[in-house]
């Protein structure tokens, strides 16, 4: 699921596939009709989930799935070979949980430090990216290459926090400010994403990648922390809503 795979069967006999939708579009007979359900998914979710794409008859391979195609046979359903196990884990105390989390984080970072190209990290100053940078600093001898993107609107600018983390771990730190009206990238991003994708951080993410590329080839990031540990306010509101629902009679 880390790398996307797009595919389509043209005229029932030709398989075209690639890691980007634009690669498939190089085929002159690729279907170009918009898939209405994909448009509905986009407006509901902000993106188009697998296996659909914006084009009818063009599909994405689901994460953790395989697809076996045989000549002369219909396209089978995608086969799931792995998924995240959601089994309860028996842990004695909260301290044990914290120790396990730190060990897993350190292991994950250490695995990704094995590379033949220069490495760095995106640093926002938040808990997620700061934890990754801290682990990198503990696991490697050379200073970590970090980069941060700030905004010219003070309430959204977090570079001060990133700078403090960089100072704490002695990183080689780069910063750049993105203007609030930096819309020059819209056409570029539309071409890169290949299909509708609503992400308010798309522009700063592209800019921080540009900044990182000045020094490194691969950069680690702290994505996923808020989703896994309920860091957004919407999770708190959802929890309160569920508590309220549980207190009310089912008839209401």
List the predicted regions and their residue ranges:
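Donor nucleotide-sugar recognition loop
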Residues: 197-200
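Active-site adenylate/phosphate-handling loop in enzymes that bind or generate adenylated species
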Residues: 207-252
